[in-house]
Structure formats: structure tokens, C-alpha cells
Amino acid sequence: MATSIPMNTNMKMPTQTLNEATDAFVLQRRKRDGGTKPLNYWGFRNETDALTDVLLGPADHLRHIATSSLSRKTLRDHPADIRVAQAQHQELLAAYVHFGVRVHWHSPQPELPMQVYARDSSVMTPYGAIITAMANWWRRGENYAALRTYERLGIPLYDMVTAGTFEGGDFNVIEDACVLIGCGAGRTQEEGARQVEGWFKKEGWETRLAFFDEYYVHIDLMVVPIAHQLTAVCLACTEPGIVTWLKAKGHEIIDVPFEDTINLGCNFMSLGRGRVIVPKSSRVLSQRLRAHGFEVAEIDMSEISKTGGGIHCMAQALRRDPLA
């Protein structure tokens, strides 16, 4: 099923309603030996339950700079039209609003031109947010801005990455208490990945590290969960051992072609309850999702993705509700 998203320049955000047992901001609530209790309201068990709250970054100060091999190529050949890119981001916002997702924002800062990619500066977990450690100097300020955002929202921090660089696009909750951690060296170093892995092992989670060439930037370029035991994977560029691991866990794989993947076609957002936001250019994935009965909202991301990321890169899930 295709979904048409109505554009409304006077969109109103869904009103945020918290339950009575709210959570309070603290800088670290992780218990060093494990056993950290899940938050009362915020967080999620997996990346496929119904999305109720999402964190986005503003595109107000977006610039097209050479942040990766992907953005470097488009900058050289066909630089992004920033006004069109910003309009496409508004279409993405409209999709979340259309599906009733409460949208929260980082505060816009002119010194942070890549702030629109809200996935990377933090990670949400059942236990609180993790402030990551960005690899590139021009993005490190996003970590400090993210800390302020969580303080403003009243969301506690689980911890902060200190052992090495680590970016949120490399934290992939495959299913309940199971995380796939990417390590491409260019953005997430093994030291940072091992630190985060150690935390979740102590919480009793199953963990798996995925090593890949830094060309692919983050693991969410090639592996993204769709629904319970249904995962989109680019088989052409994903380590076979990861695919075998997923299949052994009972996951059905939807293959995304390599050409689509390097154009961010596997970088989409599952909203849960059979709804998915997908880049318009990812036609093969859209067709295969519809064949599985999903409601697919296609958003044109052709200009904004030139700056280095896709739909999944632009969103940090803050809360998913398994009962919604």
C-alpha cells in the first residue's frame, strides 16, 4: 500500500503526554555491574515496535560538505540544492506527523551544519540515552548539543562513550535484548564499539560486532530491522557471517540491491504496526515491503541525501510502545 503524505505548512505537532511515572534527567544511570532498570516512559525494546516519539535535527543550517565518500562524490559532481534539501526534510517531518508520531527537536545551531543527522550524536536504549563520541571535528559539537537536548526533555543518560569514537548509526537493536554494533573504523573505532558492547553484555544482552569497510560509513547503511524477525539487508556488501547469524535467529531477509544501498536505499525508518518510511528512489525495497503487506510512505530524499545520510540517519527513536 502506498501512502500519500499531505503537506501542510502550518503543521501542528502532536501534543506530548507523559505517563505519571516520568523519568528524571541524570548524567549517568548505568550500573557498572549490570542490572540497570529500564526507564519508566522513554526508550524501547527494539527498533520495530510502534514509534511514538522521535528526535529530529533541524535542517536550518545544513551545508553540503565532504563528510564521507558518498557526500564527497555528489559534492564534486552534483552539489545539493540546500533549499530543495530543506523542503524534503519538511516532507519527512510531515510523514511523522501524519502517522501520529510526537516529534522532538535539537535546538538549531549555526555551528552545526550536519545537525540534521540526529541518529549519530546519541543512542536511545531501554535504560536511557547514550551520548556518543563523534569522529569528525566538525560534528563533535553535536554531542554537547545532544546532552542539552536530553536535559531539556528530562531523559536520563545511560552513559557517555569515552574509550574511542562511536556514532549512533552503528547501534542497531535487532530484536529485544540483542544489538548489532557496527565498526567501520572511519566513524566508529573498535575501542568505542567494545566499550558499548561491554555495557550491554553486563545487562544480559546478546551482542554482535560487524566489521566493514569505512566506505559504508555506518551499519545502518546496509542492515536495518523492518518488523519482528524481518530485516532489510544488502547481501552484496554485508559480511556473510552477519547474514547467517540473522537467519539462525529466525529472521527473514529482504535483500536491497547494492546500487540502491550505496544511494541510501536501505536507510529507512520502521514505524511499527506495518508502517515504514522509505526513500522514493528505493523502488525494489518499496515493492518488496508492499508484497509483505506494509504501508509504505515514500519520501523524495534525492537532494538532502547528497549531504551524506538518509531517513534512518536523520532520526533517533526516543520511545516505542509494544502495546500501541
Feature map (PLM): residue ranges:
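The feature marks the mature, well-folded catalytic cores of soluble enzymes
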Residues: 2-324
